[in-house]
Amino acid sequence: MEKDNYFLENFTSHDGKNLVIHHWPVEKPKMLIHLVHGMSEHGYRYHDFAKWLNKKGIYAYAPDLRGHGKTAGSMEDIGLFSIKNGWNKVVKDLKGITEKFSSKNPNIPTVILGHSMGSFLTRSLIIDFPETANHYIFSATASHPGLKGYLGSFIAKSNSLLFGEKTKSRLLQLLVMGEFNKKIKKPKTRKDWISRDESVVKKYINDPYCMQVFKNQFFVD
């Protein structure tokens, strides 16, 4: 039976915020890879991928970002980075986490792989702190959405002012994610866009960390 090398760690970030990090270590790694998850998911969703990386001699780790997974602290706190400067705080989180593991493993190359929202955060990290990692990978990234993006930003800021930063917004969630399933022919669920593997889709739908409605200030960020 394969030895389970997975464990969790608490990390105190730059402003004192506690972050939960998922680890999949290997002895004498030839590479470190920092997995940055997307919106409405969490680090442990990458467990199978991380175990595959382990077989290649790669040490993988994935934090639950602010407002996500175990870092959120409770289900009610999912869906919000922070009341102020949330995006920048998360970017600094990624910098601090990466530097910690790089310093513990000198002379071993570090890769940051950002998926979806995580790819946007990683792109911000490169702009602000380009020397953080040796290599970067963007998965399911995108270009500027144009008019739709400006409209969404206006709605997010208006909703945040009118209804409060911590109020959940199904409208904004629909604007961000509602188009994805339309590209799937004969979908069986509203989350078929997650994967062509039906078991992965089912697991996502049944994961309470993945099915929460996010809050106005998150969309402002």
Which residue stretches match the model-derived regions?
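Alpha/beta-hydrolase active-site loop
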Residues: S82-S102
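Glycine-rich nucleophile elbow surrounding the catalytic serine of serine-hydrolase chemistry
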Residues: G114-S124
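Alpha/beta-hydrolase fold nucleophile elbow
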Residues: N105-S116
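Conserved alpha/beta-hydrolase
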Residues: R45-E76
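N-terminal cap/lid segment of alpha/beta-hydrolase-fold proteins
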Residues: M1-K28
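The conserved beta1-alpha1 loop
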Residues: H34-G38, D64, H115
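Alpha/beta-hydrolase-fold enzymes
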Residues: T122-Y209
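Active-site glycine-rich loops that stabilize anionic/oxyanionic intermediates
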Residues: K30, G38-E41
